[in-house]
Amino acid sequence: PNPDLFPPRMIRLSDHIAAAGGWLSLEAFMQLALHHPQEGYYSTAIENIGSRGDFSTTPTLSPILAKAVAARWKEACARCGRRLPLLEIGAGSGALAVKVLEQLGFWNRLNTDYVIVESSPRLREFQHLLLGSQAKIYSTMEKALKHCGGKAFIFSNELVDAFPARVFEYTEEGWREVGLTVKDGAVREELRPVRQQPLFSHMLEYDSQPGQRLEIHDSYARWFTGWLPLWNMGVMTVIDYGDEMERLYYRRPQGSLRGYKSHQVLTGEELYRHPGLTDLTCDVNFTDLLELSRNCLGDTVTLMTQRDYLLPYAENTPQDACLLYTSDAA
């Protein structure tokens, strides 16, 4: 059927605010807008992924990331003394998977499991159509790790920033959590006292200037610690956009929460006008991510820029030069 005849439905935000008791945290709003099973962005609104769609990401621009992933996988296999399955979390259109499989070469493709974890039914359809029998696709990490026997080379690209985040604002009374309420028939932001401290972040222990906002990915921490005990051998690479705390919020009083709709950047109250039809994201605080990772995995966790990760595999092309010298991912 022609999708234009059956456009995605926009979420009735006021109904969900009422169901939550009159105040909905921004984390809950993002969860609803992105992952609602019938009306969320990842369920209905994604049509094109790449240079003309809502996502324009490294795998669609250059094979350099696939080269790096394939090389690091080989290093991990040598270190572990066995052939590890490749496990990609949040594979999007499957573009990176295709390029990684190409980089593996015929023999490795034939003898290595390529496993994808994708929570979005719509994206799983994309991946099945593109990859066919070349990849095993699961909806959860638990199912994927069971398939792998707990041993895998795990990697993700732009995954953490797709998780819902809690948003906080500093006031004269200290930190408050940002949520949504309905006033005079319109959806408005409202600050409330912090009732539950973040799981791993220490961000709220610091004072700031009134009005300063920041985001904390508690939902990622809950998800990560939920499946981690099932993983008993391998290497993990997490690639995302962000910075360490001091630089991330320097001259960014409103934080980094933003939306993308048809390549237009939305901020402020524009974020709440098209729930379910807008891709929502915020930059990753690597100070928090390192704290979480080292708490769970020890001192083996390291942080590097995307440039340093990719540089050994770069070629003299405009695409590679763009990725190496304009990216702040790590």
Q: Where are the regions a protein language model picked out?
A:
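Conserved small/polar residues in nucleotide/adenosyl-binding loops
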Residues: 2, 325-330
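Short helix/loop capping segments that flank catalytic or ligand/cofactor-binding pockets
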Residues: 42, 163-165, 246-247
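Long, Lys/Arg- and hydrophobic-enriched amphipathic alpha-helices
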Residues: 199-327
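Conserved acidic residues
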Residues: 151-152, 234
